[in-house]
């Protein structure tokens, strides 16, 4: 049997981080078994479903590197098929028309509330003849759920989960306007798509019991089910925006790499021994739904930062350069950088990446650490950098300006000899000259090594920047 999984999001917003992990698990299991992953858009809620959300979901999957087989399937466009199966269930005696009025249903709920039990439909139309139907009321179709015993969901993650049938009642599968309920549409679609494995969040477990009843009523094979634990925040509570419940597009804009996000998400609820960093091929080779944990996973942004930093350091410089430019329009200050990004600065930025990526955990940090390349003269020094250019710092800076101006050639060897000659003459340590020099060249107290910065900026720009600070500080 060829494995077919499916990712079935509702297009009511972005591809959130929990959905991305569900898609990843489905994709990995399909790849692990040599099967397929299909994409179904569950767009039956016409008021909340939008084309923009569909696009965001597909874009998010593509960015994550999670390809699906075939074309996306619209659940809404299959409404006629859902209706046909509901009618077939009635014909087979597995479902029935219910003409209970809204007033009757409200009365049932009120009675249940008064008796201290959950509201349940009382089955009053289950065995009544269709000829007794009242005038002017459009019926719904309800499934004939088992009245006693229990429905068992055989789950690869949760084990056997048992549901007393008395708690499930005769739920609606087709509304009075002819539209299918989610519960019914999902079963019909999974069957028609040939889905063999359903991998989704464990908040769908109760749905699984009701869907099992529909599968059995139709005499269809029930897919293997694996209900994975939800992702919680660092505080153990339900994941909120404050604790990471953002869309994949937000993580992209925050400067995370798709490979790093995949690596982080795969370990939320699944692991392979103590392996923390793993290649995509390793994930495909090792992943199995049998190894998914039952307990909720906690989202740890610091851990994601650490993993992303690793992938930054391991990435090709050109790829990082391209990825950084790609997110610039969506980052704070990115528009200004784009306006200043002439060919010379593009070359400087690319050359700086080997040094910048060693101290950057995200692309945004990489861009921020490269800000000295994009800034305009005269540089605005941050507070710490200003403190370095005190009287002693200015004296050193003035001496360095004269020494560098006289440097015979602007290469690493000549610049290093010039700086070390000054250090020996003045009996100083390298750090004591590097700090004021870095402040003047970058406006910051952290940057690549000062020799690297001097080479990146070139002779003219370096000397102009140093002189700017000497002119500024003289006037203080």
UniProtKB/Swiss-Prot annotation:
Xref: CDD domains: GluRS_core (cd00808)
GO cellular component annotations of the record: cytosol
Positions of ATP binding: 241
Positions of short motif 'KMSKS' region: 238-242
Gene3D superfamilies to which the protein is assigned, alphabetical: 1.10.10.350, HUPs (3.40.50.620)
Span(s) of short sequence motif 'HIGH' region: 9-19
Catalytic activity, EC: 6.1.1.17
Keyword annotations: Aminoacyl-tRNA synthetase, ATP-binding, Cytoplasm, Ligase, Nucleotide-binding, Protein biosynthesis
Known catalytic reactions: tRNA(Glu) + L-glutamate + ATP = L-glutamyl-tRNA(Glu) + AMP + diphosphate
UniProt GO molecular function: ATP binding; glutamate-tRNA ligase activity; tRNA binding; zinc ion binding
Top-level taxon in the UniProt lineage: Bacteria
GO biological process terms held by the UniProt record: glutamyl-tRNA aminoacylation
Location of this chain's protein in the cell: Cytoplasm
Subunit structure: Monomer.
UniProt function note: Catalyzes the attachment of glutamate to tRNA(Glu) in a two-step reaction: glutamate is first activated by ATP to form Glu-AMP and then transferred to the acceptor end of tRNA(Glu).
PANTHER family: GLUTAMATE--TRNA LIGASE (PTHR43311), GLUTAMATE--TRNA LIGASE, MITOCHONDRIAL-RELATED (PTHR43311:SF2)
Protein name: Glutamate--tRNA ligase 1
Record gene name: gltX1
């Amino acid at each position: 049997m060829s494995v077919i999984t499916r990712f079935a999001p509702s297009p009511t917003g972005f591809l959130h981080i929990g959905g991305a992990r569900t898609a990843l698990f489905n994709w990995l299991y399909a790849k692990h078994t040599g099967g397929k992953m299909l994409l179904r858009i569950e767009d039956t809620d016409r008021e909340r479903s939008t084309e923009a959300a569909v696009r965001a979901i597909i874009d998010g999957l593509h960015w994550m590197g999670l390809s699906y087989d075939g074309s996306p399937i619209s659940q809404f466009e299959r409404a006629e098929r859902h209706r046909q199966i509901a009618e077939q269930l009635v014909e087979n005696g597995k479902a029935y028309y219910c003409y209970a009025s809204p007033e009757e249903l409200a009365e049932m709920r009120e009675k249940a509330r008064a008796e201290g039990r959950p509201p349940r439909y009382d089955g009053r139309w289950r065995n009544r003849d269709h000829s007794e139907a009242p005038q002017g009321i459009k019926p719904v179709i309800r499934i004939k759920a088992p009245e006693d015993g229990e429905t068992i969901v055989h789950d690869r993650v949760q084990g056997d989960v048992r549901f007393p049938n008395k708690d499930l009642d005769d739920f609606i599968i087709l509304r009075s306007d002819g539209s299918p309920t989610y519960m019914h549409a999902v079963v019909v679609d999974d069957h028609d798509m040939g889905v063999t494995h359903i991998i989704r969040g464990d908040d769908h477990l109760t749905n699984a019991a009701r869907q099992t009843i529909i599968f059995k009523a139709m005499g269809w094979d029930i897919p293997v089910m694996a209900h994975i634990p939800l992702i919680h925040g660092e505080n153990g509570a339900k994941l909120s925006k404050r604790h990471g419940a953002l869309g994949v597009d937000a993580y992209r804009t925050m400067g995370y790499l798709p490979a790093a996000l995949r690596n982080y998400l795969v370990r939320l609820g699944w692991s392979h021994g103590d392996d923390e960093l793993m290649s995509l091929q390793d994930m495909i080779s090792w992943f199995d739904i049998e190894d998914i944990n039952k307990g909720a996973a906690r989202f740890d942004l610091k851990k994601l930062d650490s993993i992303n930093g690793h992938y930054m350091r391991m990435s090709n410089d050109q790829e990082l350069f391209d990825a950084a430019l790609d997110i610039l329009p969506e980052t704070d200050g990115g528009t200004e950088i784009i306006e200043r990004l002439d060919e010379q600065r593009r070359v400087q930025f690319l050359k700086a990446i080997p040094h910048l990526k060693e101290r950057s955990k995200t692309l945004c940090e990489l861009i921020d650490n490269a800000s000295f390349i994009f800034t305009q003269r005269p540089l605005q020094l941050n507070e710490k950098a200003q403190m370095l250019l005190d009287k002693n710092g200015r004296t050193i800076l003035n001496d360095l300006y004269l020494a560098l101006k006289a440097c015979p050639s602007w290469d690493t060897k000549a610049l290093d000899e010039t700086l070390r000659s000054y250090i020996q003459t003045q009996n100083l340590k390298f750090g004591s000259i590097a700090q004021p020099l870095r402040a003047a060249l970058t406006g910051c107290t952290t940057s690549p090594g000062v020799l690297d910065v001097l080479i990146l900026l070139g002779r003219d720009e370096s000397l102009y920047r140093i002189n700017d600070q000497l002119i500024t500080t003289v006037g203080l």
